[in-house]
Amino acid sequence: DAGSDLQSVRLKATFDDEHNCWRLNGVKRFITNGDADIQLVLARSEEGTTDGRGLSYFLYDRRDNAVTVRRIENKLGIKGSPTAELVFNNAPALLIGERRMGLIKYVMSLMNGARLGVGAQSVGLAEAAYQEALQYAQQREQFGKAIIRFPQVYEMLGLMRAKIDATRTLLYETSRFVDLYKTYDSISKERSLTAEERQDMKYSQRCADMMTPMLKLFASEYANQVAYDSVQIHGGSGFMKEYKCE
């Protein structure tokens, strides 16, 4: 039930001294690719805690037969990535990294990549919807001329193009900042960074942390708007499955 409030994760992790491993118990919902054999999972390892400082990161193998996929969600889209509800019944798991750092350090570091993925996916979807609308508007004739020659349709296509180009620019700039700070992080494992490099790394990370949620917001919103407008330009045909914009 935690949803986006990751600090409220309630899946419980307890250490099994006899078998020298961690055990996971509880339910998790809306888990991306939840039917995979190997999974990373955030769980509460510190008894009595209620915030992010009590969460650790674990790896489990579903082939241990201690995790049940209770259901696969029937989603509106993104059907190639199963979203599952999982039940953990004393599932053995391995601790990843340090205790108590699951959310603060590890999950948050993965969020930038996930948000970039959503942004790129949204830009691609919007571009495809625009191209379908443009092609249809150029070919479909009403009242003796192609509908792209009607001001309302031409203006709608222009706004769609502007939204896509703006979002693509935000995607590329956000990706640049993520690349920079990750590159500096990799270099720092081989040698000490100069003062200028450390400053640039911190700046790039701050920009990435700020821009990735913005990218996810605007890209996904504009993708929905562009897809909707594509259906509108297709008219009644946009409601039919034989047309790709549906």
PLM-predicted stretches and their roles:
Residues 1-16, 48:
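Beta-sandwich/jelly-roll carbohydrate-recognition scaffolds of carbohydrate-active enzymes
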Residues 1-4, 30-32, 49, 75-82:
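Short Gly/Pro-enriched turn/cap motifs at secondary-structure boundaries
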Residues 6-8, 16-17, 21, 87, ...:
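Alpha-helical interface subdomain recognition
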Residues 21, 25-67:
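A short core secondary-structure module
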Residues 63-66, 70, 82-114, 131-149:
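A glycine-rich, basic-preceded beta-loop-alpha segment at the flavin cofactor/substrate interface
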